Amino acid sequence: MVGYRLKNTVSDNGTVSRGVCQLDSGSLRKVKETLKIKKYPDGRITDTENPAQEVPLDPESVVSMNFWGLPLDFEEMRPIHHLPPELAPEEQKAECLLPVLVDRLITAGRLDVAVLHTDAVWFGVTYQEDRPVVEQALKALHENGTYPPSLKG
């Protein structure tokens, strides 16, 4: 799994979901899918799932952005591969929280996950207001040669 710094993965425009990780000697020991992480203008980052009692989060915490290297034949993934095609409308928009499954397997002793660290800044469009920031970041990556002039091949 690629581990990002929490501070490098949050939006200025609203809450995000991240798998907050606990590590031991470079291995993932626990991952908690945290659904309402909020960054404040002063740099504080909190878990706001319970608004009456926000929980401070360490900006340097390692989080999962769902970059997992799992074998294609990984038997434990079968429930995800075999979702019924006739899902109800509310289920069609449901999110499959892979960190929840991974955490269960780690806890049961059926999975070991090495963590590769990155200091890269994650950017994505979670909110419409994120779009200009992402466009500028992509433009900068093209201009500095990180990305080729065209990604079309």
For each feature predicted by the language model, list its residue ranges.
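A C-terminal functional module that forms or caps the active site or interfaces directly
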Residues: 78-110
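Conserved core of the sugar-phosphate nucleotidyltransferase
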Residues: 1-68
